[in-house]
Amino acid sequence: MEGAGGANDKKKISSERRKEKSRDAARSRRSKESEVFYELAHQLPLPHNVSSHLDKASVMRLTISYLRVRKLLDAGDLDIEDDMKAQMNCFYLKALDGFVMVLTDDGDMIYISDNVNKYMGLTQFELTGHSVFDFTHPCDHEEMREMLTHRNGLVKKGKEQNTQRSFFLRMKCTLTSRGRTMNIKSATWKVLHCTGHIHVYDTNSNQPQCGYKKPPMTCLVLICEPIPHPSNIEIPLDSKTFLSRHSLDMKFSYCDERITELMGYEPEELLGRSIYEYYHALDSDHLTKTHHDMFTKGQVTTGQYRMLAKRGGYVWVETQATVIYNTKNSQPQCIVCVNYVVSGIIQHDLIFSLQQTECVLKPVESSDMKMTQLFTKVESEDTSSLFDKLKKEPDALTLLAPAAGDTIISLDFGSNDTETDDQQLEEVPLYNDVMLPSPNEKLQNINLAMSPLPTAETPKPLRSSADPALNQEVALKLEPNPESLELSFTMPQIQDQTPSPSDGSTRQSSPEPNSPSEYCFYVDSDMVNEFKLELVEKLFAEDTEAKNPFSTQDTDLDLEMLAPYIPMDDDFQLRSFDQLSPLESSSASPESASPQSTVTVFQQTQIQEPTANATTTTATTDELKTVTKDRMEDIKILIASPSPTHIHKETTSATSSPYRDTQSRTASPNRAGKGVIEQTEKSHPRSPNVLSVALSQRTTVPEEELNPKILALQNAQRKRKMEHDGSLFQAVGIGTLLQQPDDHAATTSLSWKRVKGCKSSEQNGMEQKTIILIPSDLACRLLGQSMDESGLPQLTSYDCEVNAPIQGSRNLLQGEELLRALDQVN
């Protein structure tokens, strides 16, 4: 039993010793291995602080890479470096805008420069010996393998196999925008422009003695240049660089001004144009592929290409393009390009595109351009030379025809003074009814003929606070439009007869009156002395000269085709609008054709009844002499009446008219009541009651306040008939106080309007006033005011037409009654 137990103890001791020896041997091997790796690490061309911290795998990886590089370098024909080249080696990497990377045919990075940390954030020792596929974008692996492949097939004669490589590679970057380093797991993709070539190294020269032939060594040597983002460009751009922005279809949306100095283009002429229009044709394929890579990988560098200049030739340009993405939806928004012009304009006399021919070819002048230049020349040309030029170009004659909408300027060839003609053309009085008269003295006659309003005459408003008898409600009805108050009509000439030299001289010498009271018409001196027409001219100043072109009518105009007025009653006869024909036919002397209708009236009265006229003239002259100068203040400003349309509306809208029947078309406005006449005669006794009623002063009188005689007179006037030889007057004015013989009431060529103003007075009893109205061609009336704001009834053309006097004198004052009435008035 004891022997068996001792044997077991010996076995245990021997196994423990073997295990210990095995552990010691393994420890010895590891220590030796560590020593070998330590020695190997120190054999690598690395700094001591780096090599001392390498693990075994890193030492093996770096050693293998070093051996491959050594093999690569031994295969090449390397010159012996002198001291100068050794000193310059440190500047090569600084001159490069990237790092150097050497790849094997299987993608291992056997060499990478130490400045890779500056661009990618990863150190040289972390990348050397690793596969490039571990640090590149998965979408770029296929392209990377294609770039590493070297085809050894047969090459066509005259062609060498292309070993140049240029591609874009997205690689992991641990650098932030602020230059800090992040974890490799949080790295972003950075686009590298890799350019280089494939080297094939034949190692048969170092063939061992055993006779084994090694395959040639293939490697790809690249210079990797990262593309900076436009927002991170630190170096300021020089004068040979310009910025541009494009849409996704590569059309210009912005361009820097420096392109004008470099290539001749203006930034405005490039907007909206595609950049493909300015590429050289030989570089279009390369740039098309580059743009495809830009949209795929986000950034590209075009390399050097030719871009056409404006006036011919081209320049070499290198562009860095970056796709700008929307921060909200990460969709591409635009493209920003940094263009580096690396040369001047080459072959500037050579044309490569149609855009360059626009600056070389002369523009063809069309006939339209020639005609424009012909008429816009500053120097004046003779009309004969102008005709010769137009004759040589018949196509240009069509441009002389006026088109629709062209302004036609009438030329005045009567004057030789150029300056005065220009001034007249500048001051032609257009629409003088609303414009001020021209200050030019040469245009005074034109203004007088064109303007219906006198220059110093200001239309008074209809409503006045100084009128106590004005009803506010009536004023509102009678003043719908203030513009109608500014319209006026003047009396046209009776005949189109050339004025006498005396008339012409009078018009030229006499200035335009400042007020209507200064209006006057001139007659013979004997008639002035006999009738004292100065008072009449101021009382009834009526401009008989045609100044309104719209109201001027020819007396020979036949108005037979106009429809006559047909009332609803059957007691009216149809008659024609034969204006002033009896007046013209009865004129026997040249003086009767004068524009002054008042003179004609006086002349006709003298011819028809010499005896009665003498009596009337004597009575009228005596009465007019009694008028004192202080009573002339009662004569107010002459204000023209509105149009007959307004008068008709006012007539039909009278509120208290005695003819209020809706079916009666002969209703006339209200007449002034006795209260107004009483107030007038009490305030100014023994004075001529020659008054005019303005449109704003018409008052409404109830029917019960009207005198029965006035009602009888108005009813009689409604029933009168029109004679075939009676004259129709479209405008009525207040005439002078004249007496008409009773015998010639039917044969007189002028129809007189008589209105009787009756009043009952305690002292004088019943008084009658006869107002004789002078005929005119237009609807105008004389409006005036007295000191006590009273007035006479208003007579319109409507009253003249309907209430014309008839034969018979049963309603007219005759003989002594007329003289008595005149005495009472005065």
UniProtKB/Swiss-Prot annotation:
Region span, ID: 576-785
Keywords attached to this entry: Acetylation, Activator, Cytoplasm, DNA-binding, Glycoprotein, Host-virus interaction, Hydroxylation, Isopeptide bond, Nucleus, Phosphoprotein, Repeat, S-nitrosylation, Transcription, Transcription regulation, Ubl conjugation
(3S)-3-hydroxyasparagine carried by residues: N803
Chain positions found as Phosphoserine: S247, S551, S576, S589, S657
Tissue expression from the record: Expressed in most tissues with highest levels in kidney and heart. Overexpressed in the majority of common human cancers and their metastases, due to the presence of intratumoral hypoxia and as a result of mutations in genes encoding oncoproteins and tumor suppressors. A higher level expression seen in pituitary tumors as compared to the pituitary gland.
Effect of K532R: Reduced ubiquitination. No change in sumoylation nor on interaction with NAA10. No change in HIF1A protein turnover rate but increased transcriptional activity. Complete loss of ubiquitination, but no change in VHL binding
Record's GO cellular component terms: axon cytoplasm; chromatin; cytoplasm; cytosol; euchromatin; motile cilium; nuclear body; nuclear speck
Stretches for region Interaction with TSGA10: 1-401
Mod. after translation: S-nitrosylation of Cys-800 may be responsible for increased recruitment of p300 coactivator necessary for transcriptional activity of HIF-1 complex. Requires phosphorylation for DNA-binding. Phosphorylation at Ser-247 by CSNK1D/CK1 represses kinase activity and impairs ARNT binding. Phosphorylation by GSK3-beta and PLK3 promote degradation by the proteasome.
Subunit structure: Interacts with the ARNT; forms a heterodimer that binds core DNA sequence 5'-TACGTG-3' within the hypoxia response element (HRE) of target gene promoters. Interacts with COPS5; the interaction increases the transcriptional activity of HIF1A through increased stability. Interacts with EP300 (via TAZ-type 1 domains); the interaction is stimulated in response to hypoxia and inhibited by CITED2. Interacts with CREBBP (via TAZ-type 1 domains). Interacts with NCOA1, NCOA2, APEX1 and HSP90.
Protein name: Hypoxia-inducible factor 1-alpha
Organism of provenance: Homo sapiens (Human)
Protein encoded by which gene: HIF1A
